[in-house]
Amino acid sequence: MQQRVIVGMSGGVDSSVSAALLLQQGYQVEGLFMKNWEEDDGTEYCTAMEDLADAQAVADKIGIKLHTANFAMEYWDRVFEHFLAEYAAGRTPNPDILCNKEIKFRAFLDHAMTLGADFIATGHYARRAETAYNSKGEAYAPLLRGLDKNKDQTYFLHAVHGREINKTLFPVGEIEKPEVRRIAEELDLATAKKKDSTGICFIGERRFNDFLKQYLPAQPGKIVLDNGKEVGEHHGLMYYTLGQRGGIGLGGMKGASEGAWFVLHKDVANNRLVVGQGHDHPLMQSTQLWSEAIDWVAGEQNIPAEGLRCTAKTRYRQPDQACTVFIDENSEHGVRVEFDEPQRAVTPGQSVVFYSDEVCLGGGVIHHTNAPTPNFI
């Protein structure tokens, strides 16, 4: 009997080709287009209608049914409110990670199961291993890096539990992006030459600062140098991220060298932005970080007393960094991570993701690091 797969179709080339490949592999395939954001300003920032039309055109071309579902309420409650709270606290969140965990691999998966699916599929560049069992006897599928290392998206999928991965197929995870484009052109799919989406879907083409301002009141404050000297005013700490180069408004400052300016530290308590010159400024360097809650793909991870040796990324596309992970005795589910080499601009609110060779073990949100605090704070 044919197994039924419902593909999350976004109107992009990766999910389009995923659906086509699954058909070729003999599955009974249907598509589902998710609407995760309600337009409220009457303008076409988000291309949701265009994306739906593209998904429908592909579904018609390959001869499959396309369902639609509205998860805007779930998105607001489970993703967007957290996104705003993190920015309000001076951190820099990554909503794509939470969206995958709560919407694409929870709300969508649950909905697909009510439609009678055996599996869901997405256009992510990732792979899964055969079903395994953790120490509690729970079935899960280990998450593996995508074959195309330049496009691998496991960083964004690390918070998805292995039991959900066990119900998911990743057709394009087994091939490289140029091949995906070639297949789409060969099949004459409407999305063959469509640009990859960038940015967060609910912001679309808007300037990020303008969007954020609609939801959080800006709190301007002082810009200070690494010695505490005031040199200007910032528009609100939420608009800046650690390690950011430029966009600070200090170009041509009297008495300063011609070098670029970088965000070194956010003094949230005093609403001050600390800046300085030098790509590898000491205030941006850390060798340890702490995360208060880790999502392990297997639902668990044995961490010996001497620590777990693995590699980690603290941002997407960063080369793997050798590290040791320890249980943090001061938090119920947290870890402390020691890196072999100093790390630059590790950012609270972003995620640290752990790997053992090809296997993505899981990860968590960075709470704080041991980067030095400016001595005037």
From Swiss-Prot:
One of its GO terms (biological process) is tRNA wobble position uridine thiolation. Residues 94-96 are annotated as: Interaction with target base in tRNA. Coiled coil: none annotated. It is found in: Cytoplasm. Transmembrane segments: none annotated. It holds the Pfam family tRNA_Me_trans. Its EC number is 2.8.1.13. It comes from the Bacteria. Catalyzes the 2-thiolation of uridine at the wobble position (U34) of tRNA, leading to the formation of s(2)U34. The gene is mnmA. GO terms for cellular component: cytoplasm. Belongs to the MnmA/TRMU family. It comes from Acinetobacter baumannii (strain ACICU). Residues 151-153, 315-316 are annotated as: Interaction with tRNA. Keywords: ATP-binding, Cytoplasm, Disulfide bond, Nucleotide-binding, RNA-binding, Transferase, tRNA processing, tRNA-binding. This is tRNA-specific 2-thiouridylase MnmA. GO terms for molecular function: ATP binding; tRNA binding; tRNA-uridine 2-sulfurtransferase activity. The active site is at residues 99, 201. The record marks 124, 350 as: Interaction with tRNA. Disulfide bonds join 99-201. Its main location: cytoplasm. ATP binds at residues 8-15, 34, 123. It catalyses: S-sulfanyl-L-cysteinyl-[protein] + uridine(34) in tRNA + AH2 + ATP = 2-thiouridine(34) in tRNA + L-cysteinyl-[protein] + A + AMP + diphosphate + H(+).
